[in-house]
Amino acid sequence: MQQDKINLLGLNQKAIEDFFISIGEKKFHARQVFKWIHKKGVIDFDSMTDLGKNLRNKLKENAEIVIPKVVFNKASKDGTHKWLIDVGGSAVETVFIPEEGRGTLCVSSQVGCTLNCSFCSTGKQGFNRNLSSAEVISQLWIAARTLSKNNGEHDFSVTNIVMMGMGEPLMNFENVVPAMDIMMDDLAYGLSRRKVTLSTSGVVPRIYDLLEQSGVSLAVSLHAPTDSLRNEIVPINKKYNIDELLEACKLYAEKGPHKHITFEYTLMEEVNDNLSDAEQLIELLRSREVPAKINLIPFNPYPGTPYRKPSNNRIHRFKEFLQHNGFVTTVRKTRGDDIDAACGQLAGDVMDKTKRKERYLKKLGDKNAI
């Protein structure tokens, strides 16, 4: 019985070296192939010209390099790109945001999301599955190739990665960490730990694991200054409360690549955007002695949501209050909203990307058939 071929795309350098040893080849060939895939964008073994013919044939027998299909690539009038990527019958989205001197790629980690935050459109799709490490890194591979063609130079690029797309990355730890290893490998994309940011809603045990095994920059989706409010809008808070979360954040700031944690705070009118909320947020972060930067995200409305985006005056007032109290505070610019690529909008053109309804109807049909 023929064994399934291994997809080399998602293997970090250590794993691809182990694979080459397992087929009786030397480690340095693994590094050659690794570089061909990620540095040069070559996925055909026969095009890897510094490999011998016998090795190329052996690789074709035992391995493959599979890139998911791009369903579409949309470009916004502000230069933002959004890719819809087919991952075995479901779909995920990846967004590239160009700014002066940098280009940020927002990468998805799951098909849908398990956490069901009340204000997030992605969570309304339900959850299908975790992405493989190959599916995670393929988003960067696809973006790098597309952007180099658009700009006529291979090195235009993605300078920063944010694991802030669809899904909770720390709920897919085993696949996200190897993919981030590839992002930071000098034989691949060569990004520093400071340039790769993982955003979590607060899977506290995995924050400690992340510090030990990866140490990329950390952002935390806080969104509320009290447990009572956070329990309502970020349900994982019922399992890992704010005290536990900030204790992990404090250690991460001490040991991680940045000496601060970025706290993301989605502003929703009359929910968490009052000055009393800002006062509580300041007291919370000061009392826990967590070095913090605060990134305010004006809510992006989507069909059926009960929440509203605050007025510009309310956003400005909240930001000014935090700044006057000594906190570095930014307001995230809304980018790509004309192609549903703005933060919280990654449910996009095909609302049921996780096939939730389809799976439910099939299950119902199977039960009726019994």
Swiss-Prot record:
S-adenosyl-L-methionine binds at residues 167-168, 199, 221-223, 300. Binds 1 [4Fe-4S] cluster. The cluster is coordinated with 3 cysteines and an exchangeable S-adenosyl-L-methionine. [4Fe-4S] cluster binds at residues 113, 117, 120. CDD domains: Radical_SAM. Pfam families: Radical_SAM (PF04055), RlmN_N (PF21016). Its cofactor is [4Fe-4S] cluster. Disulfide bonds join 106-343. Keywords: 4Fe-4S, Cytoplasm, Disulfide bond, Iron, Iron-sulfur, Metal-binding, Methyltransferase, rRNA processing, S-adenosyl-L-methionine, Transferase, tRNA processing. GO terms for cellular component: cytoplasm. Specifically methylates position 2 of adenine 2503 in 23S rRNA and position 2 of adenine 37 in tRNAs. m2A2503 modification seems to play a crucial role in the proofreading step occurring at the peptidyl transferase center and thus would serve to optimize ribosomal fidelity. This is Dual-specificity RNA methyltransferase RlmN.
